């Protein structure tokens, strides 16, 4: 999928080298089809790395996508240069009168805090409430999935005995367009200290569990219309993300396990094995095509 992003975004050069089609604004205006308008609320500390990971996946189908990057006004990013934020990102107050075909809310390293103690929780709940009637389909990733399930449906999160880190085998539990083309079993990364539980989700008639893992638990949950999709893992992670997180934690003297099913021979000095790439690309492609492009109104103002 050609993606139309602001000129000068660092991700553009990297993705172009990988063969991802990044379209200039001048070329984009000459296409007759309406581009999909996708909003990304980037809550991850390393925003540039997350941009690359998500844009890589959004740029993998034949449709044109216009991407708008969003940050929270109530929290000042500490790990990304403010110049980058001011140049490439916008605020909720600047977009709240617009409508979007799709919306991605990323994970965030705040999962051990009660939701209400997260410093941008009030702003996030305002944004999530806004998404009900101003976005056709929203994908919540990792902590955002827990936050969305809690805010919309009252699903609690639970602290795990130790960090869940690694790549785990999952199975599709319900046939749906999101998993069209998937094998019955596939692999996906997780990196978190908390979980949502199957028994809590099964009590809510509006929700369906679409994929799960014996080791990592619930993976993908969606409402009946698939306009809200909750992903408890990190399919967007690249080959080295779990490795980098592991060494970061070790350097902080944290007691964390070696990421499971990731390093050959469970040896952190060896190059990690990439086993989830086809799932990640197909999952995002299916979301864009089946959950958004084939269902969203042609006129954005008709989204409600």
Curated annotation (Swiss-Prot):
Instruction: Report the subcellular localization.
Output: Cytoplasm
Active-site annotation: 142 (acyl-thioester intermediate), 234 (proton acceptor), 236
By its UniProt entry, which Gene3D superfamilies does this protein fall under? 3.40.50.880
Transferase: is it a keyword of this entry?
yes
The record's GO CC annotations read: cytoplasm
Which residues does the annotation list for site: Important for acyl-CoA specificity? 111
* Pfam families the UniProt entry points to: HTS
Site (Important for substrate specificity) at 191
EC main class here is: transferase
Where does this chain mainly localize?
Answer: cytoplasm
Family of this protein: Belongs to the MetA family.
Task: Supply the name of the protein.
Answer: Homoserine O-acetyltransferase
Traced from the root, the source organism's taxonomic lineage reads: Bacteria, Thermotogati, Thermotogota, Thermotogae, Thermotogales
User: Which gene name does the record give?
Assistant: metAA
């Amino acid at each position: 999928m050609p993606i139309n992003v602001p000129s000068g975004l660092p991700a553009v050069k990297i993705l172009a080298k990988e063969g991802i089609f990044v379209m200039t604004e001048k070329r984009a205006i000459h296409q007759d089809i309406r581009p999909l308008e996708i909003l990304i609320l980037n809550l991850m500390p390393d925003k540039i790395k997350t941009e690359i990971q998500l844009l890589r996946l959004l740029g993998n189908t034949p449709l044109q996508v216009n991407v708008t990057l969003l940050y929270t006004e109530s929290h000042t990013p500490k790990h990304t240069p403010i110049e980058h934020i001011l140049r490439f990102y916008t605020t909720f107050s600047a977009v709240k009168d617009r409508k979007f075909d799709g919306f991605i809310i990323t994970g965030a390293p705040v999962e051990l805090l009660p939701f209400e103690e997260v410093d941008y929780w009030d702003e996030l709940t305002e944004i999530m409430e806004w998404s009900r009637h101003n976005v056709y389909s929203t994908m919540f990733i990792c902590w955002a999935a827990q936050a969305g399930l809690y805010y919309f449906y009252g699903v609690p999160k639970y602290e795990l005995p130790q960090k869940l880190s690694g790549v785990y085998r999952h199975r599709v539990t319900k046939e749906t367009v999101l998993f069209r083309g998937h094998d019955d079993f596939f692999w996906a990364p997780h990196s978190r200290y908390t979980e949502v539980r199957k028994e809590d989700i099964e009590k809510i008639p509006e929700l369906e569990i679409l994929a799960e893992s014996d080791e990592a638990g619930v993976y993908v949950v969606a409402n009946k219309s698939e306009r809200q999709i909750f992903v408890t893992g990190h399919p967007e992670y690249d080959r080295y993300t779990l490795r980098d997180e592991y060494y970061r934690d070790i350097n902080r003297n944290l007691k964390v396990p070696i990421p499971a099913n990731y390093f050959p021979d469970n040896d952190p000095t060896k190059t990690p094995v990439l086993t989830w790439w086809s799932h990640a690309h197909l999952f995002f492609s299916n979301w864009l095509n089946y959950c958004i492009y084939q269902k969203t109104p042609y006129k954005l103002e008709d989204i409600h």
